[in-house]
């Protein structure tokens, strides 16, 4: 069955979500790929610093979505979606730092921030509404 939360559509399967079918997870995976491409533009000096931190942040988003979906309670789901949302906010700040330092330009950063905003809204809906049993 699936539910609509405004523009946010979230899929559920029994008491354990099929995380691979979750639209928010799919969008987070797309963001991860896009961020990896963007971080290739950072200077070599940032390879083990800012670039590595950005990649950890972006990987944390779909990873926590999957872990939360694999749990059996709304409290667990909400916890991991909250962690994923926090990682999204951390990533937003890191991307803004890249733009401020002229490592990435606004054409690189703006689409990533747009993707992040949509993912955060979807995560907020999951945090608010939990899962349907």
Each language-model region and where it sits:
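Short, C-terminally biased terminal segments at protein or domain edges
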Residues: 1-133
